[in-house]
Design a protein with these regions (language model features):
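Nucleotide-sugar-dependent
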Residues: 194-202, 250-287, 293-304
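Membrane-proximal helix-turn-helix segments that form the acceptor-binding/catalytic region
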Residues: 89-90, 118-137
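A charged, aromatic-enriched C-terminal amphipathic alpha-helix characteristic of glycosyltransferases
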Residues: 324-362
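Conserved catalytic-core segment of nucleotide-activated headgroup transferases in glycan assembly
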Residues: 17-36, 161-255, 259
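N-terminal pre-catalytic "stem/leader" segment of glycosyltransferase-like enzymes
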Residues: 1-78, 306
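Active-site proximal beta-strand in glycosyltransferases
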Residues: 70, 91-110
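Donor nucleotide-sugar binding/catalytic pocket of nucleotide-sugar-dependent glycosyltransferases
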Residues: 132-170
Length: 366
């Protein structure tokens, strides 16, 4: 934290309020889960913290008088913009509560294969206007900050973390490998590839044809697990793949840990949209105890295994599948890379969260 920032006066009462844009994705990971921990944060007896999340806007200005920040998460429509205008004109003249725009995704220039592209393309100007009215912004990555700097000049970064109180301890699969078929996992939403029902006439996505063919041909050799969604190209072998449908985000950690994957893969196309993503999959794969194989894109610069082509990813899958010691070394290297970032509850990550919000306005905890 910048030494020129001013410490808040004690005793202090900090209030965090968030209007959620979603309650199952980044709204949970970046707002609901850390807000649960904020209520338990105690660095000193002289600091009290309250936090609250809402889905429906409250128009009465008096409601906001006890809050230090009002966060709007993933606001993207004309309706949201009108709420910003109301807050600026009706609330801020009475109470000095800044608007902080929280965002974990690139909402501009979304690839055609991503079914969200239609929604955000038509609302792109409202996204920019909401950012322009914000008193500050929080992004999940430095690259995302760089992209949005055109629309807001007061942006800080809070990386993603996982809640250990939900994920629990790590039990690496290589520690109890039983010699059975190797389990390989992919998890994610349908945004990673085109769907004929959602994006008619559009093809492509994060899975290349050679990787898809490899998966198709190795369903007898490996146990493939897809969690959340699955490419249409794999439908001919769907009965040989274990597919787990979408999971509630609070149940997702238990579901993927129960699989006990030996290897987890994160193929991503190298494009500006994916360059803005966080390393959330690297955190999740580490928390699962799996050896991770990633595409060589910006979010995974710290990973031990990064691949540039389908052929390279296939080669690494085969190498790790045949060598438990290689899986162990891969996991240990990746765990070392993300250890300080991994859990909200460790490495002062909750305190850093608070200080990042205060730092937007040149303040900090004592």
């Amino acid at each position: 934290m910048n030494k020129h920032y001013k410490s808040i006066k004690l005793p202090a009462r900090l209030g965090f309020l968030s209007y959620l844009g979603d309650v199952q994705g980044c709204g949970t990971i970046r707002v609901i889960q850390p807000f649960l921990l904020l209520n338990h944060y105690r660095s000193t007896k002289n600091v009290q913290i309250i936090s609250q999340t809402l889905s429906h806007y409250i128009f009465e200005p008096e409601y906001y008088k006890n809050f230090t920040f009002c966060q709007f998460q993933r606001s993207a429509t004309e309706h949201h913009f009108k709420l910003f205008l109301h807050f600026k004109s009706q609330v801020q003249p009475k109470f000095n509560v800044p608007i902080v725009y929280e965002i974990d995704d690139m909402l501009i220039g979304i690839p055609d294969y991503n079914y969200a592209t239609q929604y955000y393309t038509k609302n792109e100007e409202w996204v920019k206007k909401c950012m322009g009215l914000s008193d500050g912004m929080i992004t999940s990555t430095p690259q995302l900050k760089k992209v949005y700097a055109e629309y807001c000049n007061n942006i800080s970064v809070i990386p993603n973390h996982l809640p250990k109180f939900i994920w629990g301890d790590i039990y690496p699969a290589h520690d109890y490998y039983d010699g059975e078929k190797i389990k390989i996992l992919w998890s994610g939403s349908q945004n990673h590839f085109a769907h004929s029902q959602l994006t008619p006439g559009v093809h492509g996505g994060d899975f290349g044809n050679k990787l898809l063919n490899f998966i198709t041909k190795t369903t007898d050799k490996y146990d493939w697990y897809f969690v959340g969604s699955m490419p249409n190209e794999l439908m001919p072998v769907k009965d040989k793949i274990c597919f787990l449908p979408w999971q509630n985000i609070f149940e997702y950690p238990m579901a993927v840990k129960a699989i006990e994957p030996d290897i987890a893969i994160a193929p991503l196309m190298d494009n500006p949209f994916n360059a803005c993503k966080s390393n959330i999959k690297m955190l999740e794969f580490t928390a699962m105890g799996a050896a991770g194989i990633y595409s060589n894109v910006l979010p995974y610069y710290a990973a031990k295994i990064k691949t540039n082509t389908d052929e390279e990813m296939i080669s690494e899958i085969e190498r790790l599948a045949d060598d438990v010691d290689a899986r162990r070394k891969t996991f240990q290297r990746d765990y070392s890379s993300v250890r300080s970032q991994l859990w909200w509850e460790e490495a002062n990550n909750v305190k850093n969260y608070i200080n990042t919000y205060l730092g937007l306005f040149r303040q900090r905890l004592p």
